[in-house]
A protein has these predicted regions:
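Membrane-proximal alpha-helical anchors
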Residues: 10-77
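Eukaryote-biased recognition of C-terminal alpha-helical segments
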Residues: 107-148
Length: 148
């Protein structure tokens, strides 16, 4: 807006078109920033909805695994691997700045809940040996679970 003040007080010929151009540029920039923010919010909502839908679909199975006391065989293992992959995807989008800190911390507290079970932790450790989870580690989960 300082540029408009300089143009107005300069008395230069054609200053009206300079004012219009400056205003149009400023408004265009504001629109661009606002649209980008809205697009990011929409992406967050889509990711949040998708991640929660996928978690909800496996929640009962995860609870059954945690409540059980038998060895984890192929079917429960598959559910856990799907869950760990979901957690890794969430982490990837968190690192990229698309998942809010509070949401990520809440999800980490849920991960800690499951990973406290020794049998689930054994499957986690075996999966982490493959190093295919975008750098997500137990240490990261535990640290981020404590953040609000």
């Amino acid at each position: 807006m300082a540029a408009i003040a300089v143009i107005v007080t300069s008395g230069a010929p054609g200053r009206e078109s300079l004012i219009a151009t400056t205003l149009a540029t400023a408004l265009g920039f504001c629109y661009f920033v606002q649209k980008q923010k809205l697009d990011e919010l929409r992406l967050f909502k889509d990711l949040f909805t998708d991640f929660n839908r996928r978690y909800d679909a496996m929640n009962a199975k995860l609870e059954d695994i945690r409540a059980g006391d038998r060895r984890i065989d192929s079917e429960p293992r598959s559910t856990l691997v799907d869950y760990f992959n979901l957690c890794a995807e969430e982490y990837l989008f968190f690192k990229e700045g698309y998942i809010h800190r509070g949401v990520w911390s809440s999800w980490c507290r849920g991960m800690v809940y499951y990973l406290r079970d020794d049998r689930i932790r054994q499957v986690w450790n075996a999966e982490m040996a493959s190093d295919s989870h975008y750098g997500l580690t137990l240490n990261t989960i535990e640290q981020d679970a404590s953040k609000r």
